[in-house]
C-alpha cells in the first residue's frame, strides 16, 4: 500500500546552506496495517508525511502510495489518500456539516451516498451535537473531529494522519 525507499528531503537556506529534513528513510506499509512514525521534534516525521501526500516533493528516493509514484503520479496518489495535516484549517463561516459535505462534493460522491456517509461519520465520531455549529465557535477538539471527518468522507484506501489526537480527549 505504501512503499518508501531511501526517501530524503533537503531545503536550501540562504544563511545555513542545505538543511536535511529527512535522510534516506525506508519502510513499507501493507493494506490494513496501522503504522506510526516516532521520533523527536524535528526528526522529519511531518516532512515525510507531506511527501507521501504530495504536498512536498522528495529530493531523493522513491515513494509509492496505493501503487502510484508520488513524484510522477501525484493526482492519482491524492485520489487514493485521506490526508490530515497537523495544522489543517477550519472555515469559520461554515458549519461542521457544511465543511465535511463540501469535501465530499469535491470528491464527486453521489448525493444519496454522501448523505449516508455524513450521517454515519457524524454518529461514529459523536459529532451530531456540533453538526450546525460554525467553525468560529468550535473548540480545538471539535475542529479536530471535523478535520478527521473530512479526511475520511471519500472512504480512501490509505489514511495519513499527522498528530490526529491533538486537542482530543483520548
Walk through the language-model features, giving the residues of each.
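Catalytic Walker B motif of ABC-type/P-loop ATPase nucleotide-binding domains
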Residues: 159-162
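Conserved catalytic motifs of ABC-family nucleotide-binding domains
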Residues: 155
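Walker A (P-loop) phosphate-binding loop of ABC-type ATPase nucleotide-binding domains
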Residues: 40-44
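A short, flexible loop at the N-terminus of ABC-type nucleotide-binding domains that lies
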Residues: 1-4, 10-24, 31, 74
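Hydrophobic anchor residue at the start of the ABC signature
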Residues: 148
Amino acid at each position: 500500500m505504501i512503499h518508501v525507499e531511501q526517501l530524503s528531503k533537503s531545503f536550501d537556506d540562504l544563511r545555513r546552506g542545505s538543511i536535511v529534513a529527512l535522510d534516506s528513510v525506508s519502510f513499507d506499509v501493507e493494506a490494513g496495517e496501522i503504522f506510526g512514525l516516532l521520533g523527536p521534534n524535528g526528526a522529519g516525521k511531518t516532512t515525510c508525511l507531506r511527501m507521501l501526500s504530495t504536498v512536498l516533493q522528495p529530493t531523493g528516493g522513491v515513494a509509492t502510495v496505493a501503487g502510484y509514484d508520488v513524484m510522477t503520479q501525484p493526482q492519482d496518489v491524492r485520489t487514493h489518500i485521506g490526508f490530515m495535516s497537523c495544522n489543517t484549517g477550519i472555515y469559520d463561516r461554515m458549519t461542521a456539516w457544511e465543511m465535511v459535505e463540501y469535501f465530499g462534493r469535491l470528491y464527486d460522491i453521489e448525493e444519496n451516498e454522501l448523505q449516508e456517509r455524513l450521517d454515519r461519520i457524524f454518529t461514529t465520531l459523536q459529532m451530531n451535537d456540533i453538526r450546525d455549529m460554525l467553525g468560529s465557535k468550535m473548540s480545538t477538539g471539535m475542529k479536530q473531529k471535523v478535520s478527521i471527518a473530512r479526511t475520511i468522507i471519500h472512504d480512501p484506501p490509505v489514511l495519513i494522519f499527522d498528530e490526529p489526537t491533538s486537542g482530543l480527549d483520548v
